[in-house]
Curated annotation (Swiss-Prot):
Disulfide-linked positions: none
Cofactor: pyridoxal 5'-phosphate
EC identifiers of the protein: 4.3.1.18
Source organism (scientific name): Aeromonas hydrophila subsp. hydrophila (strain ATCC 7966 / DSM 30187 / BCRC 13018 / CCUG 14551 / JCM 1027 / KCTC 2358 / NCIMB 9240 / NCTC 8049)
Protein name: Probable D-serine dehydratase
GO MF annotations, alphabetized: D-serine ammonia-lyase activity; hydro-lyase activity; pyridoxal phosphate binding
Gene name as annotated: dsdA
Chemical reaction(s) catalysed: D-serine = pyruvate + NH4(+)
Amino acid sequence: MKHIDVSQLTQQFPLLQSLIALEPVSWFNPKATTLVEGVPYVGLDGSDVADASARLARFAPYLCEAFPETRASKGILESDIAAIPAMQATLNQRYGVEVTGRLLLKKDSHLPISGSIKARGGIYEVLAHAEQLAIKAGLLCEEDDYRKLFTDEFRHFFGQYSIAVGSTGNLGMSIGIMSARLGFRVTVHMSADAREWKKRKLRKHGAIVVEYAEDYGVAVEQGRKEAERDPNCFFIDDENSRTLFLGYAVAGERVKKQFDDMGIVVDADHPLFVYLPCGVGGGPGGVAFGLKLAFGDNVHCLFAEPTHSPCMLLGVHTGLHDAIAVQDLGIDNLTAADGLAVGRASGFVGRAMERLLAGFYTLSDQEMYDLLGLLARAEQIKLEPSALAGMAGPWRVAANLEWQASQGLNAAKMVRATHLVWATGGGMVPAEEMENYLASAHR
């Protein structure tokens, strides 16, 4: 990794001074372009997402057997979209800026199995790997009833193999729980930020948890090294995995169907804004890609990061991507938003998506705690701190009339806009832990 000359870089990119000072910033992306121009840089397209969607449909009968809580949705892991008008009124007052469109919450926080957005990509990649192994061994065909995977024969077969992953928490939970249920031996390398209850839950499901005193990057690197030593070990690489990315991307067509069912129109006169908390970038990157395929140029996706961990904003803004970490600027990467505590962004996601993202913003830990408390009070919905990162987004957009004008977004269009805040986790947080979160909120 070449040496970073911070003073030269801050001269070239003055916004970095605010990042270094840990000031909340908003940056609207001048590289953003149309779907047609941006998609070729991703290296994936709609057919890849359709393939992922078909694979999840094949596994749905198996998931019904393995996780009875998925039976109501026929083995399809999907979350509700809820209107949150009381929160909208509260925040219009708090921020002194009026968001005039409709405010909705995407409750990935309450997805079955692992209670976070990571149930999309993490579970999908484990299923894709299991399918590949079973087909290669002549035990499975795509036309089979996948319920046969929920048998001792298959558990014994998968028991010959292991899976490893590095995680700040939620990805590890999704991959650990899914891998163990299939019969794999699974090791989750957890960074210092990982919550204790997540480690306990993983161990209860039969996963091996290895703890590190360092951050996410170290946990991933150690997981990668362990997998290299064992030919039967598959490493799920959150920084570079196209399979994970596609698992998240399936969300786009699902949201489109939900909107159709809700009678919500998205077109040039009814824009859609989606606000996604961002850690290393795989989850929000994949979801944003799926949304762009579903809604084209009528959806504007923004990534939200903690002031202490603005890795994707830093990578895309400077064009250095994974060649720079927040620590290179003296930023500590210590945040209460454990799922977002990442110092170096995914180079794959940054390069793939930099032309398809409308903007980025940062907010403080205290702001996330305050939003957590306000949402619990206004709407009786309880989330973990990182899931609130997206909640400030509509007001960042509303405050920037210059950017709106550059996109042809006038007041009439903004009144008809839909703002979708992606709640990434928190549905499985233990009550005692949630009380601590709520106590950290300033009223």
